[in-house]
């Protein structure tokens, strides 16, 4: 008896553009053979706002409030890199106290970033409960930011060339210590609830695997790189701010799958709490900003003793010139390597401001790791990358 062959035509499916609160306005054009993904083409650019061009006609202090809109889950990292670029180019020293305050803010942001990744990722794979838990903890971080900067999620506008805008308010350190004491057991609670859950393990173990060589060749960074067996963290490599003063570990895994990426992020939250505790304990006295950056007049007429409007409010001087030269500055954000390539032209505006977003580079590998997986695994793999479209499209 002759066999009847069934041949199916590949089906092209549009996923997205999703709502910004999900994985951002990302559109995936997926080619399917039955349930299997043959090809995937990400379409980006729906959230492009010309952030690099805006930077080229704003002074630094005017531009800082804009930058929390790149990666709107990690506003502090964006602000830090925005002031680090001119600082390195103009060789401006940052006082020790300001460095410690910056580290505390950045690590709080790392926790908030990983929490905001964890909730929706769990919802993607079918676990709705942790989504509500993570918002409870993030709310506390936002309360701390509100006390220190006046704003919650974005637009903290806190970092300045040569330091921070204002000192920590009275009682803030104690509140932050309380948060650390509260948050540590909560991470254990997440682990108890999620890590050894058999349904969760079966759902994400072994999918979206990236080998060590692939991770390096595709230019991945952050938890994506560390989950593939590369022990690389810019806080240890570049020794920026004052991370060398603290005792902490770089966490990494070798499996390279979605579960490994989950483990790396969960453990990083614990390390962040460790760093914050040490920074709060050893917070030095002294100034929280470098006054030189606030100096209005320059050259021979500039006298430190006279009151001739050399200082203006709490801002960096509007006449602060970015010196001639070029520089690439990078830091380890919650998603990976966030970098700025700045070209100065002895002007108050930068001549070129190139943003190297971590999640944009991490998203490149998506079509490669989606080939051959089931259609149901697409959201789990996309979720494990941790992208924010504001940062991808800029």
From Swiss-Prot:
The protein's enzyme class: translocase
This protein's record includes keyword NAD: yes
Pfam families, sorted: Complex1_49kDa (PF00346)
InterPro entries found in the cross-reference section: NADH_Q_OxRdtase_suD (IPR001135), NADH_UbQ_OxRdtase_49kDa_CS (IPR014029), NDH1_su_D/H (IPR022885), NiFe-Hase_large (IPR029014)
Reactions listed under catalytic activity: a plastoquinone + NADH + (n+1) H(+)(in) = a plastoquinol + NAD(+) + n H(+)(out); a plastoquinone + NADPH + (n+1) H(+)(in) = a plastoquinol + NADP(+) + n H(+)(out)
A biological-process GO annotation: photosynthesis, light reaction
PANTHER family named among the record's database cross-references: NADH DEHYDROGENASE [UBIQUINONE] IRON-SULFUR PROTEIN 2, MITOCHONDRIAL, NADH-UBIQUINONE OXIDOREDUCTASE 49 KDA SUBUNIT
Described function: NDH-1 shuttles electrons from an unknown electron donor, via FMN and iron-sulfur (Fe-S) centers, to quinones in the respiratory and/or the photosynthetic chain. The immediate electron acceptor for the enzyme in this species is believed to be plastoquinone. Couples the redox reaction to proton translocation, and thus conserves the redox energy in a proton gradient. Cyanobacterial NDH-1 also plays a role in inorganic carbon-concentration.
Annotated family: Belongs to the complex I 49 kDa subunit family.
Name assigned to this protein: NAD(P)H-quinone oxidoreductase subunit H
Organism: Microcystis aeruginosa (strain NIES-843 / IAM M-2473)
Gene: ndhH
